Amino acid sequence: MRAILDKNNSRLRIISKIEKPQALENIDDIIEYSDGIMVARGDLGIETPIQQLPIVQKTIIRKTNAVRKPVIVATQMLESMIENPMPTRAEASDVANAIIDGADAVMLSGETAAGKYPVEAVSIMKKIAEDINNSQFMRKNEFPSTIRTEENAIPMSIAVSVADTLKNLPKAKGVIALTATGYTTALISECRPSVPIYSFCEDAKVGRFMQLFNSVSSIKVDDKNIEIDKSSLIELNEFLKKELGMETGDCVIITGSVPHLMSGQSTNFMKIHKIS
């Protein structure tokens, strides 16, 4: 499939759904050729010894995290909400633990497709995710020990600098990642930053894919030739205050590539910006 897409210059993304034991035997290759991974625990649980399923889930998450690709945990997350307005305690813990393990996204299926309480299911999952992300149990501003080093060290150096800066800048309200491909945004996401990442991108398809990554909200912009100058910073200040609720005196971290911040070149720039 990857060869066919490449041959036709397609930018479609491949999210591989892991549901067979045979996939586990080739999981490293599958992750390499995929843009993201879904742990489909329903079918996987049928063909895998039930006591092994939590180990399999954690292993897939760690391997996918290590190469900075999004990983989705799905199936029977809040299964009881197909019939009931509240989940079981075990289900709430299951969702939380998937996020602690490193899942970028958790996914509902039958709860919203055929359940009696679809809106409530989404609302409760959102609350669980937000609370666990803000808890002391989450890794914050730290990269996992398993993360692979980069052949292109500059974007990784920027991402590490962002993580280190956030540790020492308690007033920071967000990371503004100006990107053409989302590459550095994905790197920064893997450190599980203590603040939201706002991924500014001209390409709507890239922006939608970035939404899968932990802590990332994508914002579409119309001009990829943005430069760091006085007028651009004034516009950014107004946007951050009006659209994102930030205030004068708040700080954000800006990343991009100079001279044009979203030119498609590797990220080579980081700036601490105080909103005025």
Q: What positions do the PLM features span?
A:
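Non-catalytic helical/linker scaffolds that mediate oligomerization, partner binding
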Residues: 1-276
